[in-house]
Structure formats: structure tokens, C-alpha cells
């Protein structure tokens, strides 16, 4: 467990956040679940070009029409609750860096994921490269506030695509001994990184433990593409963890309302979470439902909007009702530079994730321009702020003897 987030700080954060959580809105949560069940039963989920997934879902009771499978949401929840662990250990090369993920554990913080562009400390703007990637991994390792070094912190534009998974793996293993995330470029790449990471960690497989967490995204609305489906299968069969997420643009790829986005996103992730358990009961999973308003004038998402924070709070509660760890987003922003806008928007999103009880917070440092850019300056500032979140405070002074205090006060009065 990270030294900067001892148990008492998780408990304190939970106490403060309890006032904002919708756990008392039992009727609202049940309405979302029932509406998602209706979406699954009447509309279904599209599983593109993956007959294996469709076949296994049919065996589990799904009704397939082409690549669309209609599902029983209540049964999916039963599968998830029966098999998915509420907590698991994410291992690093250094056992002292191992991080628990899930119920009662501190949040895990990982940096931005997937930025093609980089802004250096001197303000120069470059495409991502192997050299820069190694520097970002080293920065994540040196930051006490980041307990996971992530994956694809920037895109290695100077490296051929088929080499990037192993180049990133080498950077994470050689520049850090913290846990990191797995690669999903292809099922073969995922398996290769899993096997090589297991060799580097050099510890036997153990129930409730894994070496990598992989980002598996649905494609809203109500679709899974072939590569995430095949990667999910390969990852689950290897006993590694998947973070099954729906990342929606409200008004573009999902309904514009908070409730509508929650219903759609919950239907999407239920299917993915249950699939992992069908492939391998007990496979570690994390649930993510994230939605951001879409600005139709600029044709870009608006990060930091309060609507997205409501989605986070309800998504976290839905995840707790399933009994699985929950994803949150970190200091994400629509700002182009690291300014007051980026601080305000990023701070709101990060605060909502922490207060909601999120177990794994992605994009916790470095994010600019709707995620198209990683900034070294913002990376360092965000990481420093994360370290302060769990920094122990000085204990109060020992109480002064009452008689001495009275004597001093009386002398002051006489003066």
C-alpha cells in the first residue's frame, strides 16, 4: 500500500465524500439498472466480427441476431457478483510497490494515456518519441503521488507500430519498478507483454493478484469492436485484469442527459464485465462509466463540466452495487495550456473521482487539450498535488497544563 495513502486517509476521504454520494438514492439507482436491463433486452449490444464472443454469449442465454446480442441484465449482474473480485493486488517488479485495487484500498493514480503530442518544459511542442516516453516513465516513477506508471503516456511516433508494445514495455520495466498497465494493440501484443512482465516480476501466480491492468473500451453507442473483444478474452484467460469502460460524449455518442448516459454506459460495461467472468471466473476487473458533455459548436468534449461529476458519483455507486473496483478520471481539462482553466477543470474532475471512492484514477497527471497533449510542466504539477492529497499532517501540540495556562492569563490581565 502506498505510504502516502495510509488506511486512515482513505477512511477520512470516505467520511467527507459520504455526504456527496448517491448511495441513499436507492430508487434512482434501481431505475438506472432496470432501464439498462431494458436496453440490453430490447436493443442489445453489437459485438463486431468476433464469432467466439457471440457463441459464448448465446451459450449463456443471449439471443443473437447477426452481430447484435440481446442479453439478460439481471443475469449479467449475478455472474459479475458471483465471480468478480471486490479487490485484487496489482504487482510491480518491486514487491514494496504492490498496490491493492478495490474495496477499502487507497486510490491508484496513473498518468495520462494515449497523447500523440508533447509539450516540453521549455514550451516546445513535439510529437511523442521513444526518448520522451522513457523520460515520462522516469518522471512517473519519481513522483510519490503516482502509484502506477500507466501505459502509452505518449505515442512513440518515431517507432513502427508493431514495435511499440515492446518498446513501451522496456521503458516501464527499465525506468521504473512500479506497477504499470498492459498493452492492447492486439491480442498477440497483449499476451506477449503479459508473459514478459510475468518473467520480470518473477513471482508465481497467486489468486487475487495480477501484474497488469488493461484498458478495454466499449465504443458508444452499444458497440464493441473486434480488437477490444479479442484482447479481453486473451487477458482474462491469462488471469490478468481488465478495466472495462464506456467513455461517452453526451449528446454525440450517448443521450445528452446524465440519466440517459448512465443507462447506456451501464448496459455497455455490464456486457464486458460479465464476458471477462465467462471467459475466466474470478478474472480481476474494474468498471468505468465516464461521460462528458459534447460542445456542438466546437465539436469537442467539455471536460470539467459538473454533469460529468454527477455521472462519476452515480457510476461509482453502481459499481459498488456490483461489488467491483471503480475507475475515475484525473486532472483532465479542455485547456490548451497549464493555466487557471486547466487547474480548475482538472481539480473538479479529480476531486469528484476521489470523493466518489474511485479505485483506479487514470489520466491523473499531464493531460492537456482534451487529451491530445501531455505537458511535462502539468505532469509534474499534477503529480505534486497528488502527493499532497495523502500527505500526513503534523499532529496537534501536546495540551498545555491548565494551571500554567491560568497563571499566564492572570499575569497578562494584571499587565
Residue locations for each model-derived region?
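Short beta-alpha connecting loops at secondary-structure transitions
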Residues: 17-21, 298-303, 331-338, 366-378
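Short juxta-domain linker segments that transition from a proline/glycine-rich
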Residues: 102-104, 108-112, 132, 141, ...
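Short acidic/histidine-rich active-site segments
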Residues: 359-367
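Helix-rich catalytic cores of soluble enzyme domains
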Residues: 124-355, 359
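Glycine-rich, N-terminal phosphate-binding loop and its surrounding beta-alpha-beta segment
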Residues: 51, 55-120
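Catalytic-core signal marking the mid-to-C-terminal active-site face
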Residues: 2-11, 22-35, 43-58, 377-415
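N-terminal small/glycine-rich loop or linker at the start of catalytic domains
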Residues: 28-32, 37, 101-123, 321-333
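N-terminal basic/disordered segments at the start of proteins
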Residues: 1-28, 88-113
Amino acid at each position: 500500500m502506498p505510504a502516502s495513502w495510509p488506511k486512515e486517509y482513505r477512511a477520512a476521504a470516505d467520511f467527507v465524500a459520504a455526504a456527496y454520494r448517491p448511495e441513499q438514492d436507492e430508487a434512482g439507482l434501481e431505475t438506472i439498472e432496470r432501464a439498462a436491463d431494458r436496453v440490453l433486452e430490447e436493443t442489445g449490444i453489437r459485438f463486431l466480427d468476433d464469432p467466439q464472443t457471440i457463441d459464448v454469449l448465446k451459450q449463456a442465454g443471449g439471443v443473437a441476431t447477426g452481430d447484435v446480442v440481446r442479453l439478460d441484465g439481471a443475469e449479467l449482474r449475478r455472474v459479475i457478483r458471483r465471480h468478480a473480485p471486490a479487490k485484487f493486488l496489482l504487482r510491480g517488479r518491486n514487491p514494496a510497490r504492490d498496490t491493492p485495487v478495490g474495496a477499502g484500498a487507497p486510490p491508484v493514480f496513473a498518468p495520462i494515456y494515449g497523447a500523440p503530442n508533447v509539450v516540453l518544459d521549455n514550451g516546445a511542442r513535439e510529437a511523442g518519441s521513444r526518448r520522451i516516453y522513457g523520460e515520462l516513465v522516469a518522471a512517473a516513477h519519481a513522483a510519490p503521488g503516482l502509484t502506477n506508471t500507466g501505459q502509452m503516456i505518449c505515442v512513440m511516433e518515431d517507432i513502427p507500430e508493431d514495435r511499440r508494445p515492446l518498446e513501451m514495455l522496456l521503458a516501464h520495466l527499465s525506468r521504473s519498478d512500479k506497477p504499470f498497465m498492459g498493452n492492447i494493440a492486439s491480442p498477440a501484443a497483449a499476451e506477449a507483454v503479459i508473459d514478459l512482465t510475468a518473467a520480470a516480476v518473477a513471482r508465481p501466480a497467486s489468486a487475487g493478484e495480477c501484474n497488469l491492468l488493461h484498458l478495454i473500451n466499449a465504443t458508444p453507442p452499444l458497440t464493441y469492436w473486434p480488437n477490444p473483444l479479442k484482447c479481453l478474452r486473451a487477458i482474462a484467460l491469462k488471469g490478468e485484469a481488465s478495466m472495462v469502460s464506456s467513455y461517452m460524449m453526451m449528446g454525440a455518442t450517448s443521450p445528452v442527459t446524465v440519466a440517459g448516459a448512465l443507462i447506456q454506459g451501464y448496459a455497455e460495461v455490464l456486457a464486458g464485465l460479465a464476458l471477462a467472468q465467462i471467459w475466466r471466473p474470478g478474472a480481476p476487473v474494474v468498471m468505468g462509466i465516464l461521460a462528458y458533455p459534447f460542445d456542438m459548436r466546437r465539436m469537442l468534449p467539455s471536460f470539467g463540466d459538473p454533469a460529468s461529476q454527477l455521472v462519476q458519483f452515480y457510476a461509482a455507486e453502481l459499481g459498488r452495487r456490483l461489488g467491483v473496483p471503480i475507475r475515475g478520471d484525473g486532472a483532465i481539462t479542455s485547456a490548451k495550456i497549464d493555466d487557471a482553466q486547466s487547474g480548475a477543470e482538472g481539480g473538479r474532475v479529480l476531486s469528484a473521482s476521489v470523493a466518489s471512492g474511485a479505485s483506479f484514477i487514470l489520466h491523473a497527471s499531464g493531460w492537456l487539450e482534451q487529451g491530445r497533449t501531455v505537458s511535462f510542466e502539468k505532469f509534474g504539477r499534477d503529480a505534486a498535488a497528488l502527493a499532497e492529497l495523502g500527505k500526513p499532517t503534523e499532529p496537534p501540540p501536546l495540551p498545555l497544563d491548565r494551571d500554567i495556562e491560568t497563571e499566564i492569563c492572570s499575569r497578562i490581565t494584571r499587565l
